[in-house]
Amino acid sequence: MSLKDYLRQSISKDLEVRHRDSLKIRLGERHPLSVHQHMIAARQIIKSDNAEHQHVISSLSGFLDKQKSFLKVQQRALKQLEKLDVDEIIDTAAEVKAVSNNIKETLMASTELE
């Protein structure tokens, strides 16, 4: 149920309750029109409560669906991280450092020759 439907039901409930209270004051609590309006207001209160519950449920469902997809993405990323071999990363870092040291030494040697 959309927010618009929920708001419509809520406003309708408020109007019916006000009308019920107005008739109760004007005609008395036991007047047939007051009793009838009381039943109409009670029905509208139930409809409004149902609309509110449906709106909350649909909102929570949407939120939980988004969280579920987010958690799936996070779980995939975690599995990829678990697959990475830490020793391989350390070896690669050592190789990069060795290559950079060789380049540094070569540059230092070439500047000394000039």
UniProtKB/Swiss-Prot annotation:
Q: Domain of life of the organism in this record?
A: Viruses
Q: To which protein family does this belong?
A: Belongs to the herpesviridae UL96 family.
Q: What is this protein called?
A: Protein U68
Organism this protein belongs to: Human herpesvirus 6B (strain Z29)
